[in-house]
Amino acid sequence: LCSLIHDRTHGEDGIYITYEEDNPIAFNPFYTDSGEFDVEKRESIKTLILTLWKREDEAPRRSEEVALSGAVNAYIRRITENRDVRPDFNGFYEFVRDDYRRMIEEKKVREKDFDIDGFLNVLEPFYRGGDYDFLLNSDKELDLTNKRFIVFELDNISGNKVLLPVVTLIIMETFIAKMRRLKGIRKM
């Protein structure tokens, strides 16, 4: 069905997303067709990064939530002000490692309030060269919000404690964005 829709829409719709060793699932949470980041998009990015950073049974402290929010907002400001910067997780990681580190040092944020080195260490597997560097650094400029038919095949990752929660969050974000943004369009 996906192939049929994909062919009939000349590649515009009928998106089939699955995980295979030689063709793993890849997204870019920092990409939007419009280049705009509303509150909902910002919150979904924060939730995604928080899921990567903290275990299910490990609640973030308020100071950590504030620091993460500051990092995401500052990075989004950077990529929206400078269109030459390619938005992706690698760029976010480098921004936190270099620029945001300086910003929180200037603000005198204590390490016990936000351990930036621990944060970067936990996120390193998703950064360039890490085990999951493919997952959040897709070079395809694909915003799923405007796609009319998408199939996510999860069988191959159903037992993966790293991939499944991330892919599930991206599916949820896509669904919620479609429900809220696409006014007057029938959704099924």
Identify what each model region corresponds to.
Residues 1-13, 17-188:
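P-loop NTPase motor domains
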